[in-house]
Amino acid sequence: MARLDHNPGRETAGMLTGPLCLDRRGFVLASLASLAASPAMGARGPIRVLIVDGVSNHDWRLTTRLLLKILESTGLFAVSISTSPPKADAPGWDQWRPDFESCDVVLQTYNDIWGGPAWPERVKSAFETFVARGGGVFFLHSANNAFADWPAYNEMIGLGWREKDFGRAIYIDDDERQAVIPAGVGEGTDHGPRYDALVRRIGEHPVHEGLPRAWMTADVELYRYARGPACQLEVLSYAREPQTRMNWPMEWTVMYGRGRCYVANYGHVWDGDKDPVTLRSVDVQTILIRALQWLARREVTWPVPEDYPTAETVSIRPALP
C-alpha cells in the first residue's frame, strides 16, 4: 500500500490511497478493498469473457476480431460479445442489456468520446453492481476515454482521457515512486505519435510474475496526464514519453468495491490500420491473457513465451489469420 511521504505531491510506489480517495457517498474506498478476497465467480471451467463494443472513435470492429482470435487460440476463455446500437437515435437501445452477471470478466472497448451515446442508466447500474460485487473489468486503451460524466466509471478506471481540471494525474519519478500532479496543474490528457517504448514494470504483481524487469513494446500510443480520482490505484508499469520526458503509467489496477479493474494504454487500433502491430506484439498478447486470468481470480498460469521482447528489441508475431 502507498503512504504519503513528506512531500504532499508524492506518494510511494504502490496503491494510491489517502484523504482524497472518497467515493461519491463519502466512504473511503479502502474500506471496501478488504472485501476483495471473495470467492471467484465461475472458478471452474473456461474464463467467461464478455466483450462490450459498438461505439468508439477507434476501429472497434477490428479490435474485437483480433481480441477474439488471441483469446480463442489459448483454449482458456469462453468469449461472448455484446454490441450496442451504433447511434443514440438507432433502434435497439431498449433491448440492449449486456449480461454482465453471466461472465467473469468484462473486456470493455466502448468509447462515447466525440459525442457518442452513453449507456442507458439500467446498463450503468448493472455494470456498477457487477464490479462492486467482485467482477473483473479489462479497460482496453480508449475505454478510459469514455463516460467522463459517470462518477463510478471514473472511480473504476482511476485515470482517463480528461481535461486538466478534472482530477489528479500520476507520473512515476526516477525512484519509481508514484507522484501526484494536482487538478489544474500541467495539461489535459494527450499523446504524441505512436512509438516503440521501453516498458519498466514495478513490483511483483501476479500479471507480471516471471516477466523481465523491462522490455520493448511496439507502436504504443502512450497517454500523458491521464486524470481522475486515482483511488485504490496501483501502477504496474510505465514508459518514458518523448515530448514531456516524463514517466507515465502504461498499466494500472484499481479496486472498486470487491471488483478488480485493469487499465492498459496499449491496444490502439485506428480506422485504416491493417494488421495493427500493437495487438501482434508478444508482450501485449501475453499480458492480455494473464491480466484476464487475474481479473477472473484464477491462478495466473499463462507462460512467458520464449519470444517475449527484451529491453533492446520488440517482438512481433505474424498477422493473425
Q: Predicted regions: what is each one?
A:
Residues 45-47, 62, 73, 242-250, ...:
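Extracellular ligand-binding/catalytic regions of CAZymes and related secreted enzymes
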Residues 40-42:
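Boundary at the C-terminal end of the N-terminal hydrophobic targeting segment
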Residues 56-57, 112-113, 144-146, 213, ...:
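Short, solvent-exposed loop/turn segments at secondary-structure junctions
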Residues 54-57, 141, 194-195, 269-282:
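Active-site rim elements
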Residues 140-239, 243, 304-321:
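An acidic, glycine-rich "communication" segment
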Residues 22, 48-51, 56, 60-147:
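Helical hinge/lid and interdomain linker segments adjacent to catalytic or ligand-binding clefts
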Residues 11-34:
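N-terminal secretory signal peptides and thylakoid transit peptides that target proteins
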